[in-house]
Amino acid sequence: MRRLLSALVSILLLLCLCLVPLGIPAVAAELPPVKHLDTPIDVNNTILRNYRQLPGFYPTLARILVKNAPYNSLEDMLQIPELTEQQKALIKANAENFVFGEYQEGANQLENRINQGYYG
């Protein structure tokens, strides 16, 4: 009887394992909704915090964009090697929210563009 019960449990376990999918298919995550800004972000001279206005940018993508500025065009932004396909899609979807002002070298040091030091 004990052997029969053990065999039935083993068969049941084997059936359960066969019926459970071994992998979950990858599903592309949906992009956050695009928000239209009244005043576009000057990607060459802005600070990290300004990207908080755009869903999906702050802090990771915003940091990448600030660190790799200046850009001449949207295509320049999309050439950053560390961008994922989803991040590129997010940048393209928000293209109307960016302007490419003339880079003001020395006006905003990189560490100040990343951390303005607001601790209050």
Swiss-Prot record:
Residues 1-28 form the signal peptide. InterPro entries: PSII_PsbU. Keywords: Electron transport, Membrane, Photosynthesis, Photosystem II, Signal, Thylakoid, Transport. It is found in: Cellular thylakoid membrane. This is Photosystem II extrinsic protein U. Pfam families: PsbU (PF06514). Belongs to the PsbU family. One of the extrinsic, lumenal subunits of photosystem II (PSII). PSII is a light-driven water plastoquinone oxidoreductase, using light energy to abstract electrons from H(2)O, generating a proton gradient subsequently used for ATP formation. The extrinsic proteins stabilize the structure of photosystem II oxygen-evolving complex (OEC), the ion environment of oxygen evolution and protect the OEC against heat-induced inactivation. It is a peripheral membrane protein. NCBIfam families: PRK02515.1. The keyword Transferase does not apply. Its main location: membrane. GO terms for cellular component: extrinsic component of membrane; photosystem II oxygen evolving complex; plasma membrane-derived thylakoid membrane. Transmembrane segments: none annotated. SUPFAM superfamilies: PsbU/PolX domain-like. PSII is composed of 1 copy each of membrane proteins PsbA, PsbB, PsbC, PsbD, PsbE, PsbF, PsbH, PsbI, PsbJ, PsbK, PsbL, PsbM, PsbT, PsbX, PsbY, PsbZ, Psb30/Ycf12, peripheral proteins PsbO, CyanoQ (PsbQ), PsbU, PsbV and a large number of cofactors. It forms dimeric complexes. One of its GO terms (biological process) is photosynthesis. It comes from the Bacteria.
